[in-house]
């Protein structure tokens, strides 16, 4: 089972709102997910992002792969930097 951290589209037509979720890669975009780890609202100015850092770092350490968009959101929040520092300073 390959696990991904990706966006799940919510909201109404022309007013998107996304949940950052951990899901099996085989499940559909808006289908079943394992855990919700944040939200992303691109409609507000500036875009509003909330993330559960501990949960995301735990999933990344267990092998979850973020999608390209989620990787950008995590980098802007500084979570990817924390992950890489923790991963490469253990050795």
Swiss-Prot record:
Taxonomic superkingdom: Bacteria
GO MF annotation: an example: structural constituent of ribosome
GO cellular component: cytoplasm; small ribosomal subunit
Any one of the GO BP annotations: translation
SUPFAM superfamilies: Ribosomal protein S16
Keywords annotated in UniProt: Ribonucleoprotein, Ribosomal protein
Record Pfam families: Ribosomal_S16 (PF00886)
Family classification: Belongs to the bacterial ribosomal protein bS16 family.
UniProt-listed PANTHER family: 30S RIBOSOMAL PROTEIN S16 (PTHR12919), SMALL RIBOSOMAL SUBUNIT PROTEIN BS16M (PTHR12919:SF20)
Record protein name field: Small ribosomal subunit protein bS16
């Amino acid at each position: 089972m390959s696990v991904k951290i990706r966006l799940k589209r919510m909201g109404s037509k022309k007013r998107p709102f996304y949940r950052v979720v951990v899901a099996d890669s085989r499940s559909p975009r808006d289908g079943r997910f394992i855990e919700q780890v944040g939200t992303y609202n691109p409609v507000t100015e500036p875009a509003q992002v909330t993330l559960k850092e501990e949960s995301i770092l735990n999933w990344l350490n267990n092998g979850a792969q973020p999608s390209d968009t989620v990787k950008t959101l995590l980098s802007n929040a500084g979570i990817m930097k924390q992950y890489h520092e923790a991963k490469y300073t253990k050795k």
